[in-house]
Amino acid sequence: IDATSAITLEVNKFNRIIDSYSKTEKGTNMLNELKVDNSAIDISIKSILEYELNNDMIPENGIIITVTGSQLKYDALEKTEEFIEEQKIQVRFNNSGDEHKVSP
């Protein structure tokens, strides 16, 4: 997840986060507060975006969410996509090379 602080989430085949980290102090603090490890990817990304929105961590040009490795299933981020649309956040989603906009 690339915003003002880049976040890396490692996900298992059950779409649960097995590791999360950031190279920035702000990103690390956010992950420590949210405790996303061992949680569902959809809920975790939504929580991260909500935190970033509430803490002015979303750049004007929006956020990029990039998936490497196996693609996520089409409906894997249903709650996240609803939140993005409700909040009108600009998000580009690259699902292992298949890029599309999620935002309105």
What feature does the model see in each segment?
Residues 1-104:
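Polar, acidic low-complexity tracts enriched in Ser/Thr/Gln/Glu with frequent Gly/Pro and Thr-Pro motifs
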